[in-house]
C-alpha cells in the first residue's frame, strides 16, 4: 500500500448463531485476543487499516451495531443490509445494556487459525481445527 492510505471493510456475522466472536491472532508471538458477544446486539464487524508511512500499519477491529460509520440520516435512509439491522435505537429516557467477554491468552505452538469460539459449561473453547488444537479458558460469566 502507498503511504497515507486507508482501507475499511465490514463483515456480517453468522445470523444462525446466538453468540459470535472476533479474534486477532499473532502466530509468531503465540498470542490471541478475542471477544464473544450476542449477535443480536452486535451483528457487524468493521475492520479498518491505516498505512501512515513506510513500514507502518495500524489495524482496528470493531464489533458494532452498524456496518459502516455513516450519519444517522444515511443509516435510516439506507435501511437494513442483507436482511440485518444497521442500527440500534435507544428510546428517550431509557437504558440499554450489552455485555461481552474478552480474553487474552498465549496459544500452543502450532495454533495458527481460529475456526470457532464457543461459550459452554463455564468455559470459552477456542478451536484451530486444521491443526487439531483447542484452548479452554475459564469464563468469568455467561452471556
Segments and roles (model prediction):
Residues 1-95, 109-110:
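A contiguous, surface-exposed recognition patch within enzymatic or periplasmic domains that forms
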